[in-house]
Amino acid sequence: RLTDFRNMKTNPASSIGFQMTTEQENEIDDYSWRLDRPKLWDRAIRHFAIDEGADLVVVHHPHIIQGLEVYNGKLIAHSLGNFIFDLNYPETYPSMILNSKADESGFTEFMIDPIYIDDYLTVPAKGELGNQILNHIANLSNDLDTYVHVDKDYNKAYVIMDTSSM
């Protein structure tokens, strides 16, 4: 039983200031209204977590899918979507379960199962609906320079961690 939390490691990003600099004199800000894409500062802080030693970064707060990104050989799930909340917005209905395999060397494989919020219940997304959700995840991930292979026969998708041989 844990009784003293003072000695537990905390996320280094939560205990230090963070500043992003560019090589140009102009400041770059992302004021995009699109919630289906991670903001520049979100990506930067998640990259920082990987740079500081995280093997996997998983985000769940935006309640909508934001895609997957392979960064320095590690996976960032920018947002898995929604799982339980009863938000009544259609864009919060599709979601995913991220599965992984690991061995002593670390994570070796990531698979995606599509899910859907149907009348406030989380259910597996099968058939055409499942493939639409997986294709959406693949498209969002492609925008983050990450390839997600969709297996339409089994309603599953696989993150390709190493694309050097493609």
Task: Show the residue positions of the predicted features.
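Electropositive phosphate-/nucleotide-binding environments in soluble metabolic enzymes
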Residues: T22, R43, P90, G127, ...
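Active-site-proximal beta-strand elements of phosphoester/diester hydrolases
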Residues: R1, A77-L80, M111
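Solvent-exposed loop/turn segments at secondary-structure junctions
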Residues: L2-F5, D29-S32, P62-I65, N82-F85, ...
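A short C-terminal boundary segment appended to hydrolase-like catalytic domains
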Residues: I97-M166
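Active-site-proximal segments of metal-dependent phosphoesterases and phosphodiesterases across multiple
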Residues: R1-P12, E23-G53
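Long, Pro/Ser/Thr-rich low-complexity/intrinsically disordered regulatory tracts in eukaryotic proteins
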Residues: I16-Q19
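Conserved beta-sheet core of the metallophosphoesterase superfamily
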Residues: R37-I97
